[in-house]
């Protein structure tokens, strides 16, 4: 295999670990936003399964189909303890990436299932499980990886003084990678595990005036991934030491909600 395939495989593995954390945080953030936008509803269960075929026409056809509607129905939502709601968020995607002259075909799917309870109008607690699978092909010779990831998160929204409130989550996870590299007539393989910690803190301060509400927010997402040392099996095998990947994103936001009457 060419050097570009080796580099591409390493870059893809690093990107995968970051994407898993991002998807986990975003899934829970989407859930909390759904609850805020549907405060008056007694039933806060919500199912959200999406397919992305890498083609907007195919994706639109799926979204309008009966298959989409069936995937977004849950038989468990009426069997939960009183006060608890169930939600899910899932994606299935197919994509092609051309980077550093190396083509990468990526098939991935992720499913998050969560349960939460509304303690009062301003306080929520819950937990979520995520499982995902990725099949990545790098180049044209058969180099690639199969990855399976699991993680568990807890999350909470609680009020603070002066009408502030905070959203927080913390999670742990594991990614199991089966790696294959083709070098001429040699096929080399190996396994590598990634252990993850991640979290997010989002501080909000709603400001109400007349029929409008402005909500400034400050958010910090962070993640840490420890990659085990890795040795291939086969001729001309490569070896990699353990590695650490740290990620962090800080952002500021402003949400506007309002109701206007037009004559």
PLM regions and their residue ranges:
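Membrane translocator/pore-forming domains, dominated by Gram-negative outer-membrane beta-barrels
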Residues: 2-22, 26-29, 80-263
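Outer-membrane beta-barrel biogenesis signature
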Residues: 15-84
């Amino acid at each position: 295999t060419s050097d570009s395939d080796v580099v591409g495989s390493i870059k893809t593995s690093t990107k995968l670990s970051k994407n898993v954390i991002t998807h986990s945080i975003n899934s829970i953030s989407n859930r909390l936003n759904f609850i805020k936008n549907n405060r008056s509803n007694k039933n806060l269960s919500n199912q959200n399964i999406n397919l992305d075929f890498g083609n907007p026409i195919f994706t639109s056809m799926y979204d309008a189909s009966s298959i989409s509607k069936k995937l977004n129905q849950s038989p468990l939502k009426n069997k939960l303890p009183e006060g608890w709601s169930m939600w899910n968020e899932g994606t299935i995607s197919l994509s092609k990436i051309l980077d550093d002259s190396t083509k990468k075909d990526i098939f991935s799917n992720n499913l998050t299932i969560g349960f939460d309870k509304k303690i009062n109008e301003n306080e929520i607690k819950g937990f979520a499980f995520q499982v995902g699978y990725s099949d990545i092909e790098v180049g044209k010779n058969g180099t690639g990886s199969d990855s399976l990831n699991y993680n568990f998160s807890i999350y909470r929204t609680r009020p603070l003084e002066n009408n502030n409130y905070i959203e927080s989550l913390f999670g742990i996870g594991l990614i199991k990678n089966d790696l294959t590299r083709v070098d001429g007539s040699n096929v080399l393989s190996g396994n590598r595990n990634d252990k993850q910690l991640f979290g997010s803190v989002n501080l909000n301060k709603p400001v109400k005036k007349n029929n409008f509400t402005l909500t400034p927010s400050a958010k910090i997402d962070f993640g840490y991934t420890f990659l085990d040392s890795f040795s291939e099996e086969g001729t001309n095998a490569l070896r990699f030491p353990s590695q650490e990947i740290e990620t962090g994103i800080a952002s500021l936001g402003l949400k506007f909600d309002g109701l206007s009457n037009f004559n």
